[in-house]
């Protein structure tokens, strides 16, 4: 029973690895070697050229061009959100204090009693 189970697991893993190794991505490179290549091209023998190529490489994400305008706007939004948060906290505090005052004023002479023992 164990031999059958282990052989099934081995064949399943072998099948999975073979499918992953032959799986092609959108760019035509195998899925497992998509990132950093093990053996890079030999055209970058000079270190300075390699660094310049890496600096000029286009990445998948886009860098925002209007960061000078976006930062002050974000700062203003942050300040407004902080003011709104403070107002919300103040309103919550006033509501809870009003509710607590209402509870205490409605039963000022009541004492907590358990069976025949009152505190």
From Swiss-Prot:
Record-level GO BP terms: blood vessel diameter maintenance; regulation of blood pressure
Subcellular location: Secreted
Highest taxon in the source lineage: Eukaryota
Family assignment from sequence similarity: Belongs to the urotensin-2 family.
Function: Potent vasoconstrictor.
Propeptide stretches in the record: 29-109
Keyword terms, alphabetized: Cleavage on pair of basic residues, Disulfide bond, Hormone, Secreted, Signal
Name under which the protein is recorded: Urotensin-2B
Residues passing through the membrane, by range: none
